[in-house]
Amino acid sequence: MSVFLFPNRIKDTDFSVTRQVIALLDQHGIHALLADELAGELVDTKAVFLPQQQALAQAKQVITIGGDGTLLRIAHDCLAQSKPVLGVNLGRIGFLATCEVEELPEKLARLAAGRYTIEPRNLLRADAPAHNWHQVAMNDVVLFGNSRLHPMDYTVYCDGAFVSRYRSDGVIIATPTGSTAYSLSAGGPVLDACAAVMVLTPVFAHSIHAVPLVFSASRTLTVVAEATNRDSVYASADSHSRCDLQPGESLTITTAVEQLGLITFDETEQFRAIETKLMRR
């Protein structure tokens, strides 16, 4: 069996955790595959170095070493090749990367023995028809004004029916997985990661009545950047790909057909993460 490792050079500066993972996998007869660009820094290990896409294709699972952002950076490649992901957390929070460094011996032993589950996570698909822009997001799709000097007007429709109009700095549409990220910071609810829903959260709305709204995952949301806006707004998916929308243009958000599998060892991992990483902060 082979596993592809995707370390974050900034988080694991000396590759000490990466080396530990390689050694532990080797103890269980598992080959660690890494991108060949890392060969010079890990040449003294038992890892196998290949071009990244080739390594991904040969691997049964993917292990990211960094934080939630590290997992998000490789998520699209994992999705394209249907590879489940285990995240090792070296970051500050770790809602996606739920394996802590001290848990590596136990959890990698369970991985080798096949004693784990793959939890499918819903993703969002964002479409901007006017720009032929199509993106998939694991956490969220965000619309935000290019000008920070004044709020923008956004109108939201669900399956073509008017829902609400917001005058706000922006609007976040998040998956249950992403509900603990930017949406939470903007006052959105924490959703069960397995729930078939999505949440729309306004950012700094100029209203006492603007509240987050939860929709079924089967719905189609359309957010219109109103023609009365003084400037364009931008849409982004997981803070990566970006598209500028002119006043009057719209963005459509649906639940993606694809799902990303996260490797878990306990069905209550999300709730333990909420208790330890949010409630105690």
Q: Where in the sequence are the language-model features?
A:
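Catalytic core of DAGKc-family lipid kinases
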Residues: 93-169
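A residue-level signal for conserved active-site and pocket-lining positions in enzyme catalytic cores
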Residues: 8, 63, 67, 89, ...
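ATP/nucleoside-binding phosphotransfer catalytic cores, i.e., glycine-rich phosphate-binding loops
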Residues: 130, 135, 143, 148, ...
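Short glycine-rich anion-binding loops that position phosphate/pyrophosphate groups of nucleotides
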Residues: 10, 68-70, 93, 177-179
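Gly/Ser/Thr-rich active-site loops/lids in small-molecule metabolic enzymes
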Residues: 151, 161, 165-209
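Short, acidic/small-residue loops that bind anionic groups at enzyme active sites
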Residues: 81-99
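Short glycine/serine/threonine-rich phosphate/pyrophosphate-binding segments
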Residues: 14-15, 69-74, 180-185
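ATP/NTP phosphate-donor binding region
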Residues: 1-61, 65, 73, 102-117, ...
